[in-house]
């Protein structure tokens, strides 16, 4: 019994700790970009050319894509949830997963999130 418990803990604990570290690093990266005007500018350009160019708009309009600059988020509202939604998409919707298919990979996606955050109201 004791060996089984030790084995279980030694297998599960590293996975849990790894996942906790990933989320923390990712959120701090988005926060870092929010204080960098060049990163926010690049995020805006990427948003306009990728997201707003096809579905999402910079102003609330009657389109079938969600408006992203308010506090009403349907598919998660944390930075990590937004990252996951853009990366994997939303099943049974037009929101396809982009993966990390941006010129600078994940960094560009975090810059898009920083742009959205800096142009949205403070949500509780």
How does the language model describe each region?
Residues 33-40, 44, 57-87:
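Gly/Gly-Pro-rich "capping" loops immediately C-terminal to redox-active cysteine motifs
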Residues 43, 47-58, 112-116:
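The canonical Cys-X-X-Cys-His
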């Amino acid at each position: 019994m004791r060996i089984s418990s030790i084995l279980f803990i030694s297998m599960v604990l590293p996975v849990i700790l790894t996942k906790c570290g990933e989320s923390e690093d990712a959120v701090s990266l988005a926060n870092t970009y929010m204080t960098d005007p060049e990163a926010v500018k690049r995020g805006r350009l990427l948003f306009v050319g990728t997201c707003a160019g096809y579905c999402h708009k910079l102003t609330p309009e009657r389109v079938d894509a969600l408006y992203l600059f308010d506090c009403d988020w349907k598919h998660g509202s944390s930075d990590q949830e937004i990252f996951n939604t853009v990366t994997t998409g939303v099943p049974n919707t037009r929101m396809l997963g982009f993966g990390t298919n941006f010129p600078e990979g994940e960094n560009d996606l975090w810059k898009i999130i920083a742009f959205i955050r800096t142009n949205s109201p403070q949500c509780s």
